[in-house]
Amino acid sequence: MKALAKLERGPGLTLTRVKRPEVGHNDVLIKIRRTAICGTDIHIWKWDDWAQKTIPVPMHVGHEYVGEIVEMGQEVRGFAIGDRVSGEGHITCGFCRNCRAGRRHLCRNTVGVGVNREGAFAEYLAIPAFNAFKIPPEISDDLASIFDPFGNATHTALSFNLVGEDVLITGAGPIGIMAVAIAKHVGARNVVITDINDYRLELARKMGATRAVNVARESLRDVMADLHMTEGFDVGLEMSGVPSAFTSLLEAMNHGGKVALLGIPPAQTAIDWNQVIFKGLEIKGIYGREMFETWYKMVAMLQSGLDLSPIITHRFAADDYEQGFAAMLSGESGKVILDWTV
């Protein structure tokens, strides 16, 4: 089958031919329709320090996808040939304390699809049936293919009650931008997002941001004054991994505020702990998606009117993957979709 793989320990990916995956007793085989390019895939493309330490070579990658079940293992129940599915990209052990307690997103033995094992940038993907998630017919293939990052945004944004709250999001990548739409959808009052990328900030405005702030030119304090905010933000969502962004977020938080961290900062990042202690801030680290509560919430929000369509800005045939990666690398894109049916 056709697949997009890391064949050598260096930058780039190669469209190649690999063996179609075997289907275990508890697996489903998915014929891929669409995939989306993730920030993780950009790290793999660039072959940065993280990728060099993490990605086995050779291996085909990718973990954001939608497709159709074409084969099932003999032990699989609850699915049928022809079901349209996306899937949870974190394959968990099922035996550790967190797995047995229903907190599988905190499994200490997680294996990542397209990171630690063969991925979805291919014509077929085999995964445990437990990880597959049926997609309702009213949700498009394009939207279903981005359920993985949509899930990151959902898990982060819905970690705290947002109804009537003022929310600050630092980092206008696709996940941060989707968090804007989620926060507005569930009833936040002001949703402010910060970045230095004007293209992405404009996308955030289209997705409903009260203010999209280029902090290279505009003061967050001035924006808060314009919005008649006198006590700071109630909820902060750190999506960038940039230390200066986290610092500004802590400074802008109200006393008793709540902060969710999804962005991954450099190791040993220093912060002003006085901001945390004397403001009584609650800080929560976010990893992946809650299995499968996050997935049900994603579907429910889309079915109740959440519009994520502006975040998908580019579409290419899988054979034109280099154009897709170029769009992502340019910084002037939202989500980029690769079509495996053409």
From Swiss-Prot:
Database matches in PANTHER family? L-THREONINE 3-DEHYDROGENASE
The cofactor note from the UniProt entry for this protein is: Binds 2 Zn(2+) ions per subunit.
**Subunit organization:** Homotetramer.
Q: What is this protein called?
A: L-threonine 3-dehydrogenase
Its EC number is 1.1.1.103
GO BP term, pick one: L-threonine catabolic process to glycine
Pfam families given in the database record: ADH_N, ADH_zinc_N
**Active site, renumbered:** 40 (charge relay system), 43 (charge relay system)
Q: Which coarse location class describes where this protein primarily resides?
A: cytoplasm
Q: What is this protein's gene name?
A: tdh
> Which cofactors does this protein require?
Zn(2+)
Q: Which residues of the sequence carry a binding annotation for Zn(2+) 1?
A: 38, 63-64
| Residues annotated to bind Zn(2+) 2 | 93, 96, 99, 107
What InterPro entries would the database entry show?
ADH-like_C (IPR013149), ADH-like_N (IPR013154), ADH_Zn_CS (IPR002328), GroES-like_sf (IPR011032), L-Threonine_3-DHase (IPR004627), NAD(P)-bd_dom_sf (IPR036291), PKS_ER (IPR020843), Zn_alcohol_dh (IPR050129)
The entry lists its GO molecular-function terms as: L-threonine 3-dehydrogenase activity; zinc ion binding
